């Protein structure tokens, strides 16, 4: 049976099959352990019956005032397990945690070229809030969409009124 459970330190030794995807942002071990220590409820893994990591989500709570929100830092599912609804399930878990934390919205950044992910997020109720110019390093750098979904605390949905102009990474709060 497939299991969704909290991410553990041991998982860092067996999630390379998921992180090999070129669209998956990867980080150093200290980055993962920092998230695990500070926001464990935002760090979930999907595990196969054989113990293989099928996917994971890593996020955090941040901001203040009406900018208090849940943030998806990384969401990835192994190519072998895509199109099974695992990403949507992981997103729902992060959204539920954000609701419990009394967040106004959940946000994430996605490459503008990642059309499959953008469509999935739109199907989950996310909107393109703004474009962040040259957010992803590369040759050339690539823009990102800052996508958002309002939580129930944002009754008037102010957090998801799209901006009409792009911003630079240093202007992202």
Model-derived segments and their meaning:
Residues 2, 6-82, 91-101, 131, ...:
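Acetyl-CoA-dependent GNAT
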Residues 39, 66, 114, 138-142:
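Short acidic/glycine-enriched loop/turn segments that link adjacent beta-strands
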Residues 78, 111-114:
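Loop/turn elements at beta-strand to alpha-helix junctions within RNA-recognition modules
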Residues 85-87:
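Conserved G/P- and acidic residue-centered "switch" motifs that form tight phosphate/ATP-binding loops
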Residues 91, 114-117, 134-139:
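Short glycine/proline-centered loop/turn elements that form peptide/ligand docking sites
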Residues 98-109, 120:
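Conserved GNAT acetyl-CoA-binding A-motif
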Residues 107-109, 122, 127-146:
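Conserved catalytic-core motifs of GNAT/GCN5-like acyltransferases
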């Amino acid at each position: 049976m497939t299991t969704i459970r909290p991410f553990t330190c041991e998982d860092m030794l067996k999630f390379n099959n998921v992180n090999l995807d070129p669209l998956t942002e990867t980080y150093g071990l200290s980055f993962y352990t920092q998230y695990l220590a500070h926001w464990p409820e935002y760090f979930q893994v999907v595990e196969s019956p054989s113990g293989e990591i099928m996917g994971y989500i890593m996020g955090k709570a941040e901001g203040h005032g009406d900018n208090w929100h849940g943030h998806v830092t990384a969401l990835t599912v192994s190519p072998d397990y895509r199109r099974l609804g695992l990403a949507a399930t992981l997103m729902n878990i992060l959204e539920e945690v954000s609701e419990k934390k009394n967040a106004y919205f959940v946000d994430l950044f996605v490459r503008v070229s990642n059309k499959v992910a953008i469509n999935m997020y739109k199907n989950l109720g996310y909107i393109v809030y703004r474009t962040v110019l040259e957010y992803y390093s590369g040759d050339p750098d690539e823009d990102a969409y800052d996508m958002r979904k309002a939580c129930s605390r944002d009754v008037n949905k102010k957090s998801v009124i799209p901006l009409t102009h792009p911003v630079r990474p240093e202007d992202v709060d």
